[in-house]
A protein has these predicted regions:
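Glycine-/small-residue-enriched capping loops at alpha/beta junctions
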Residues: 1-74
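Phosphate/ribose-phosphate-bearing ligand recognition and processing surfaces
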Residues: 48-143
Length: 143
């Protein structure tokens, strides 16, 4: 995901990222979107899955909560999330979907500028997991 974003945004994004001095697991930073249609890019450092013994759930939840807080700080009305950490970091997809949706729903009251959250799912299975979790919260889901 990171490589695709950087390729599409252009070299200016990497140049700005180098000024951010890294980011801890579970935290996020924000940059301009440059050549992307998005005005901003929120960079999240999701946890590597180690069997759930290293506070991975808390770190993943922190990525979503902190991203929504940054949206509020910057007056952003919408945000799109991939399924953070479910690729090469091997976070279980069902657990990640539950954390993504529940954290987003719980964080929305402190982020009233946000009107739309999009979960960008790159497989039918991931989309089904996110839709199931949204249904648990009574949230609308558009395919």
């Amino acid at each position: 995901m990171d490589g695709a974003i950087h390729r599409a945004a252009g070299p200016e994004l990497l140049a700005e990222c180098r000024t951010l001095h890294g980011c801890e697991t579970g935290d996020v930073k924000i940059t301009r979107g440059y050549r992307l249609p998005a005005h901003r890019v929120i960079h999240a450092v999701g946890p590597v899955w180690h069997g759930g013994q290293r506070r991975e759930d808390e770190a993943l939840a922190s990525c979503y909560a902190r991203a929504l807080e940054l949206c509020e700080t910057h007056g952003l009305a919408s945000v799109a999330f991939p399924a953070i950490s479910t690729g090469i970091y091997r976070f279980p997809a069902d657990r990640a979907a539950r954390i993504a949706v529940s954290t987003s729903v719980k964080t929305l009251p402190v982020a009233p500028t946000i009107r739309r959250i999009i979960f960008c799912c790159f497989s039918d299975d991931s989309a089904a997991l996110h839709a199931r979790e949204m249904a648990e919260f009574g949230s609308p889901c558009a395919e």
